[in-house]
C-alpha cells in the first residue's frame, strides 16, 4: 500500500510514499496506544560510515553519492543456516539500507536474527530452515526440495555462500525445471538460469512490492537519501566532459560517456565469452 498527499506545497504535489501498513509498531509490542515504529535490535545493528561514493584512494568511483541522513546498518542473515530450529516472527521492520522490509526472528534457543521479510509475513508466524522444512511462506530449503512452479527469493549462487539473487522489493523467481544436479529458474529479468540443486532459497516474494510506485516529489528528499544531482554533459566545460563547451548548443558529436566511450547502442559485451548456466538470455 502507498499514500498520496494533498498538493499543499510543490513538494507534496507529486509525492507518493509507502503507507508502511505491514510494519510492526511499538504499540503492538508494548500494548500501548502508539504508532511509532519499532527500534532496531541493538545487537544486530551498528553505525556504518558513508563512503560518499569514494574508493580507498579518495577518488570518486560512483558519481552522484554523498550526504544524506545517517543510517544504522542491520545485520541480515542471508545464509539461513540455522537448521531444524523453529523461529517466531517478532516484528516486521523498516530498513533504510534496502528497498525491502526485514523481519526479526526469535529462535526456540533464544537467538535472534534478521531476515528479508517475504510478502504477507506477519508478527507471530513460524518459520524454519533446512531439509524437511514445510513448504510454507518464509521457510528456507534447497532448490531440489522445492516443487515446480514455486515462487522463491534470496537465492544462493553457490551452496553455502548466502543469498545473492532476487533480494530487492517485490521481486520473485520461479522454479521452472529440474535436471540431475541442477535446477532451472526464471529470474525477474526474464532470464532462464541454471543453479546447483544444493543452493538454498526462501519461499515467497520479497515484501514492499509497491516500492516502484513511490515518487520522491522533490530534490530535497533525494538529498536526504544521499543522492546528489546529475549534471548534463552539455552544461559542463570541455575539460569536464566530451559534450562540454561550445558557443551555445551544438550537436556535432556522437554521444559519449564522461570518459569518452561511445554510448547509446554500442555493444561492449565480448561475444566469445558465454555463460553456460544461462539457458535463455534476458536480452533475446
From Swiss-Prot:
GO term, biological process aspect, one: cytoplasmic translation
Any one Pfam family match given in the protein's UniProt record, by short name: Ribosomal_L2
Region Disordered, annotated ranges: 232-284
Bias kind Basic residues: ranges: 264-284
GO cellular component terms listed in the entry, alphabetical order: large ribosomal subunit
Keyword list, A-Z: Ribonucleoprotein, Ribosomal protein, RNA-binding, rRNA-binding
Keyword match Ubl conjugation: no
UniProt subunit comment: Part of the 50S ribosomal subunit. Forms a bridge to the 30S subunit in the 70S ribosome.
Protein name, UniProt field: Large ribosomal subunit protein uL2
Lineage: Bacteria, Pseudomonadati, Chlamydiota, Chlamydiia, Chlamydiales
Name of the gene: rplB
Amino acid at each position: 500500500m502507498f499514500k498520496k498527499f494533498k498538493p499543499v506545497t510543490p513538494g507534496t504535489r507529486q509525492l507518493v510514499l509507502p503507507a508502511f501498513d505491514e510494519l510492526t509498531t511499538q504499540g503492538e509490542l508494548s500494548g500501548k496506544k502508539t504508532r511509532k515504529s519499532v527500534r532496531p535490535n541493538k545487537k544486530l545493528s551498528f553505525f556504518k560510515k558513508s563512503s560518499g561514493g569514494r574508493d580507498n584512494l579518495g577518488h570518486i568511483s560512483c558519481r552522484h553519492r554523498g550526504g544524506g541522513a545517517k543510517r544504522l546498518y542491520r545485520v541480515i542473515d542471508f545464509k539461513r543456516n540455522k537448521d531444524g530450529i523453529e523461529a517466531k516472527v517478532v516484528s516486521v521492520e523498516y530498513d533504510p539500507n534496502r528497498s525491502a522490509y526485514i523481519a526479526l526472528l526469535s529462535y526456540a534457543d533464544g537467538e535472534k536474527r534478521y531476515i528479508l521479510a517475504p510478502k504477507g509475513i506477519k508478527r507471530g508466524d513460524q518459520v524454519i530452515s533446512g531439509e524437511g522444512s514445510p513448504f510454507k511462506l518464509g521457510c528456507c530449503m534447497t532448490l531440489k526440495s522445492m516443487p515446480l512452479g514455486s515462487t522463491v527469493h534470496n537465492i544462493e549462487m553457490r551452496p553455502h555462500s548466502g543469498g545473492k539473487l532476487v533480494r530487492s522489493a517485490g521481486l520473485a523467481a520461479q522454479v521452472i525445471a529440474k535436471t540431475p544436479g541442477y535446477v532451472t529458474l526464471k529470474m525477474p529479468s526474464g532470464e532462464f538460469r541454471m543453479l546447483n540443486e544444493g543452493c538454498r532459497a526462501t519461499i515467497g516474494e520479497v515484501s514492499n512490492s509497491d516500492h516502484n510506485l513511490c515518487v520522491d516529489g522533490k530534490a530535497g528528499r533525494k538529498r536526504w537519501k544521499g543522492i546528489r544531482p546529475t549534471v548534463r554533459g552539455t552544461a559542463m566545460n570541455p575539460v569536464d566532459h566530451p559534450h562540454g563547451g561550445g558557443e551555445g548548443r551544438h550537436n556535432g558529436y556522437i554521444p559519449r560517456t564522461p570518459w569518452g566511450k561511445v554510448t547509446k547502442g554500442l555493444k561492449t559485451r565480448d561475444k566469445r565469452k558465454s555463460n553456460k548456466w544461462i539457458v535463455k538470455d534476458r536480452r533475446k
